[in-house]
Amino acid sequence: MEKIVKFDLKYDELLKKIPYKYAIPVVVAKRAEAIREYARPFVITDDENYVSIAFMELSLNYIRIKNEEILKALIPKVK
């Protein structure tokens, strides 16, 4: 039997793993749209909100950001 995931979103902890604060909502929105349209969620949960499910998947490393090297180039170097 598969475990039902309970989840409390901590955006600050997510930013420690993925330091691109503007990329996170885009990735989550795209994944939520995919779940709504055709994809099955990677986590089993009672939550029916697609955005919450996508945040769970990102936080639990079921999905990741592609081309992270390109995003690293966009981080400003502050002196």
Swiss-Prot record:
<dbReference type="InterPro" id="IPR006110">
    <property type="entry name" value="Pol_omega/Rpo6/RPB6"/>
</dbReference>
<keyword id="KW-0548">Nucleotidyltransferase</keyword>
<dbReference type="InterPro" id="IPR003716">
    <property type="entry name" value="DNA-dir_RNA_pol_omega"/>
</dbReference>
<comment type="subunit">
    <text>The RNAP catalytic core consists of 2 alpha, 1 beta, 1 beta' and 1 omega subunit. When a sigma factor is associated with the core the holoenzyme is formed, which can initiate transcription.</text>
</comment>
<dbReference type="GO" id="GO:0000428">
    <property type="term" value="C:DNA-directed RNA polymerase complex"/>
</dbReference>
<dbReference type="GO" id="GO:0006351">
    <property type="term" value="P:DNA-templated transcription"/>
</dbReference>
<protein>
    <recommendedName>
        <fullName>DNA-directed RNA polymerase subunit omega</fullName>
        <ecNumber>2.7.7.6</ecNumber>
    </recommendedName>
</protein>
<dbReference type="InterPro" id="IPR036161">
    <property type="entry name" value="RPB6/omega-like_sf"/>
</dbReference>
<keyword id="KW-0240">DNA-directed RNA polymerase</keyword>
<dbReference type="GO" id="GO:0003899">
    <property type="term" value="F:DNA-directed RNA polymerase activity"/>
</dbReference>
<keyword id="KW-0808">Transferase</keyword>
<dbReference type="Pfam" id="PF01192">
    <property type="entry name" value="RNA_pol_Rpb6"/>
</dbReference>
<dbReference type="GO" id="GO:0003677">
    <property type="term" value="F:DNA binding"/>
</dbReference>
<keyword id="KW-0804">Transcription</keyword>
<comment type="similarity">
    <text>Belongs to the RNA polymerase subunit omega family.</text>
</comment>
<comment type="function">
    <text>Promotes RNA polymerase assembly. Latches the N- and C-terminal regions of the beta' subunit thereby facilitating its interaction with the beta and alpha subunits.</text>
</comment>
